[in-house]
């Protein structure tokens, strides 16, 4: 009985939540650039332009509450934001300068600056304590590919959505049904899934037990 209560308490303390934020929320220049980008892509693909979304995660685990997000490097105080990795923006050469680098945050008691503008959020993806902790453990392992390029041959550019989908797929969360709010698009999402599944295939080749692969969902 006590063991059952303990498991129940752990589940109440644990969750993985997904937030969808309009691209450039709170930043007018980023939003304008996003609108221009989507207008061009939509024209090339001969479709209606969609709203673009950036994703972030909030993870509750027995070890605490954490914000998982990719964001521009603000200063040299990354440790205060739980930064576990950095990557280049645009090109590896440009990444020598802070303004052209992004940071990967695993921020204890952190904040998502634009959370008030989140749409159809939060989405509860899991209340499994082991999944929550596994996701936290995986954050330092996320690829730090060049933001905005398809450096990993995944079929689309790597960005903040790639970070989110990579972590969810590697954690074992069912990503098949995940998609941005109605009428929206999350560029980079499929790239994270593709790269994460390569890891699973490689693990399977070494004889590890892995989840079966499934077809890519349209995001």
Regions from the language model: what does each represent?
Residues 133-141, 166, 187, 191, ...:
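Charged/polar, solvent-exposed surface patches and flexible loops
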Residues 52, 149-171:
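Active-site nucleophilic cysteine motif
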Residues 174-217:
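Accessory, usually C-terminal, subdomains that scaffold auxiliary metal cofactors
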Residues 62-65, 169-177:
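Short helix-capping/linker segments at secondary-structure and domain boundaries
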Residues 3-154, 199-202, 206-219:
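Non-catalytic ligand/cofactor/substrate-binding and regulatory segments of enzyme domains
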């Amino acid at each position: 009985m006590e063991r059952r209560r303990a498991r129940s308490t752990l589940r109440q303390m644990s969750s993985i939540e997904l937030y969808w934020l309009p691209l450039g929320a709170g930043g007018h220049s980023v939003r304008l650039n996003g609108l221009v980008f989507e207008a061009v892509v939509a024209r090339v693909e001969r479709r209606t332009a969609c709203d673009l979304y950036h994703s972030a995660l909030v993870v509750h685990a027995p070890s605490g509450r954490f914000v998982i997000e990719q964001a521009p490097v603000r200063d040299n105080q990354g440790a205060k934001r739980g930064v576990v990795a950095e990557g280049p923006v645009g090109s590896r050469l440009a990444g020598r300068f802070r303004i052209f680098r992004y940071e990967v945050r695993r921020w204890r008691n952190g904040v998502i600056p634009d959370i008030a503008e989140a749409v159809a959020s939060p989405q509860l993806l899991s209340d499994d304590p082991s999944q929550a902790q596994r996701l936290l453990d995986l954050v330092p392992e996320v690829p730090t590919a060049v933001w905005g390029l398809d450096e990993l041959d995944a079929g689309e550019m790597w960005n903040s959505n790639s970070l989110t989908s990579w972590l969810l797929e590697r954690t074992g969360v069912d990503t098949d049904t995940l998609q941005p709010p109605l009428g929206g698009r999350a560029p980079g999402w499929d790239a994270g899934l593709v790269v994460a599944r390569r890891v699973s295939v490689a693990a399977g080749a070494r004889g590890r037990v892995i989840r079966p692969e499934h077809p890519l969902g349209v995001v």
